[in-house]
Regions:
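A preference for well-ordered globular domain cores
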Residues: 1-128
Length: 128
């Protein structure tokens, strides 16, 4: 589970321009965008690849867009509570010797690194 491997779910054309990281929508929700990247493509009738817009991961929340609320929303977009508890429980079983499983340790470490990367991303993007 890598933060930069979350697939883009939003695309913006050149007319719209680069999307804002945080935006309040008309319905009272907030959109938080991350992994914003240039999107390249070959427009109809052309042969050369050019920038056709932007792509990013977009999360909508009706809660106040705090670091904690956005972190929860992003985690839930890739991992539901049951799967998260399973990671923790499998790791604890291994540590306590109930069910030895080295894969549980690796999976939990990967999850912890994901949450750490997410913390860094949120601090960097929300402080600007």
């Amino acid at each position: 589970m890598k933060l930069n491997s979350i697939e883009a779910n939003a695309h913006y054309d050149m007319a719209h321009g680069m999307p804002a990281v945080l935006e309040r929508d008309n319905d009272g929700s907030h959109l938080y965008r991350f992994n914003i990247e240039v999107e390249m493509g070959i427009p109809d009738g052309q042969e050369k690849e050019v920038q056709i817009g932007w792509k990013c991961c977009e999360i909508r929340t009706f809660n106040k867009p705090t670091k904690a609320n956005l972190k929860k929303a992003i985690i839930r977009s890739v991992l539901d509570e049951t799967a998260e508890f399973d990671l923790v429980n499998s790791y604890n079983k291994h540590v306590l010797g109930v069910a030895v499983d080295e894969n549980a340790v690796a999976a939990y470490k990967e999850y912890l690194q994901f949450t750490e990367d997410l913390d860094v991303l949120l601090v960097n993007t929300l402080s600007n």
